[in-house]
A protein has these predicted regions:
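Short, surface-exposed connector motifs at secondary-structure boundaries
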Residues: 1, 25-31, 132-134
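Cysteine-nucleophile active-site neighborhood
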Residues: 186-261
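C-terminal and late-domain segments of enzyme folds
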Residues: 128-131, 144-156, 160-162, 245-252, ...
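Phosphate-binding active sites in nucleotide-utilizing proteins
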Residues: 131-208
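Inter-motif core of Ras-like GTPase G domains
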Residues: 1-7
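Short, solvent-exposed amphipathic alpha-helical segments in soluble enzyme
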Residues: 17-20, 47-51, 150-156, 178, ...
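Internal gly/pro-rich beta-alpha loop/helix module
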Residues: 10-127
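Short, glycine-/Ser/Thr-/acidic-enriched flexible segments
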Residues: 140-143, 168, 185-187, 220-221, ...
Length: 331
């Protein structure tokens, strides 16, 4: 099912659909949905242009600013920061789709697809889980960028997840054996994070005791001494600042030393997406050797901190390693 942004198209929409339909013979385009259509006349022109292709048009959605999601420096403003507006937009979108899409046609198209190849993905780890593993996970608006599958993999490896908000929680969750500080927007909430001194001190002491701490991107900034002059946790001997320059791209990397997350030599693929810099970019024991870019990140005691966002389903041994460390079993 191909969704086409038709806002600036008429007959050229047919060229786009024809290109997608013929580019890869393994892919069958079984239907088209036209998005951001301007008017009835615009829709008629689009349908007439597409008719000779024989690809059914299963719907046409009108341009509607009330359905647009606001943007800022790292993409869309998260739904967690605009729950009421986001909920209303989803409700309205459902009404529009119900009126303007051939939902029965979409279902028929889905049923016509062949079976997927390969084994279904499962977050469950083989073998018995280590007892008593509890992982504290940073949440709240400052740390809202997490792959849900990463959390499923932690649970599948036997961990109980304990959520806390670094901007407002008074302390770390009781009984936590490891910390997971994901990505997010610490720069937007730097004042709140800095003002929560008891929580910052709890994180610092947790790391100083050699306990497992995994941080990526926003979590890396939070572990630094400071972020744009505001005090952070001081776990890492590094300062963080916003630069106004975008760092974006996919990365290949290799773990340079063993840590609470990765065994030395582990190869991963991930991505970076930020407007910040950490100085120095790597510690005495870097987390990764990034292909074409050099050493990056920090490994110190139980801490593994890096800019790389990783989807752990590609390396399920990593969340299992973290859960074992949280349970005190060892890697």
């Amino acid at each position: 099912l191909l969704v086409v942004d038709a806002s600036a198209m008429a007959r050229s929409a047919a060229a786009v659909v024809h290109g997608y339909s013929t580019f890869d013979p393994r892919v069958r385009v079984g239907g088209v949905v036209l998005n951001r259509v301007g008017s009835d006349a615009h829709e008629r022109m689009l349908r007439e242009a597409l008719s000779p292709l024989g690809v059914p048009v299963l719907g046409a959605l009108r341009r509607d600013g009330r359905l647009a999601a606001p943007e800022r420096h790292l993409g869309l403003v998260p739904a967690a920061e605009r729950r009421r507006a986001a909920g209303e937009a989803v409700r309205r979108l459902g009404e529009v789709i119900g009126r303007r899409l051939d939902l029965e046609g979409v279902l028929r198209l889905a049923r016509s697809a062949g079976p997927l190849e390969g084994e279904p993905w499962s977050p469950e780890a083989p073998g018995p889980p280590p007892p008593g593993a509890r992982v504290a996970v940073a949440s709240g608006p400052a740390f809202s960028f997490l792959y849900e599958e990463n959390l499923e993999l932690l649970r599948g490896a036997g961990a109980e997840l304990l959520f806390f908000d670094p901007a407002s929680s008074e302390g770390l969750p009781e009984g936590a054996g490891a910390l997971y500080l994901g990505g997010g927007f610490p720069e937007v909430y730097a004042a709140e994070l800095s003002e929560n001194r008891p929580l910052r001190e709890a994180v610092r002491l947790f790391a100083a005791a050699g306990r497992p701490v995994v941080a990526e991107c926003g979590g890396l900034l939070y572990l630094a001494r400071s972020l744009d002059g505001r005090e952070m946790c001081g776990v890492l001997d590094a300062g963080a600042r916003m630069t106004g320059r975008l760092t974006l791209g996919y990365r290949r990397a290799r773990a340079l030393s063993g840590s609470s997350l990765a065994e030395a030599g582990t190869e991963v693929r991930g991505h970076e997406f930020h407007y910040s810099a950490v100085e120095p970019a790597a510690g005495e024991r870097p987390a990764w050797e990034v292909e074409g870019r050099g050493p990056e990140g920090f490994v110190a005691g139980g801490v593994h901190a890096s800019y790389l966002h990783l989807h752990w389903a590609a390396r399920p041994q990593m969340p299992r390693r973290l859960v074992r460390a949280a349970a005190g079993v060892g890697a």
